[in-house]
Amino acid sequence: EQALLQYVSREAARTAMNLLVKRDYAEAELYRKLRDKGYSEFFAGKGIEYVSAYHYLDDARYARQMIGSRKDTTSRKMMVSRMRQKGLSDEVIQEAMEEADWTDEMGLTRELRRRFSSAEQIESLTDKDRQKLIQSLMRKGYGYSDIQHVIRHLDELEEGTIWN
């Protein structure tokens, strides 16, 4: 019986390692994956313990990587939502967000630069197209007031860094 417990524990740890080889996971996400693969709560926990002991699993690092890879295309609000879906704790999320040098205004300017080659293009939009743009940005999680602020100050942004 002891040998069987050790064997299944090793298999759970091996499965966790194989999953982590492909990509990083949040602890809760990896736990769900192990459970989906048929491991009981006990053995899924053993697999998590093993990879955590060797620092292969680190929620804070995972949160920082998520922010680094998505901050150019996602609002802070949307990022927090995605992190919660991955099972990251509010403490880890808050810490990672505080460390990040990132504002929604920066994300909006990057998004506008990606879509338009100059500020004049945005200013020349019809009211209908401007509303479509605003709605599109709001679906990405940006606030209406932030969007209005960035669009209103495009001339300053043009002189600064966005289109230079």
Where in the sequence are the language-model features?
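An alpha-helical, amphipathic repeat domain used for nucleic-acid recognition
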Residues: E1-N164
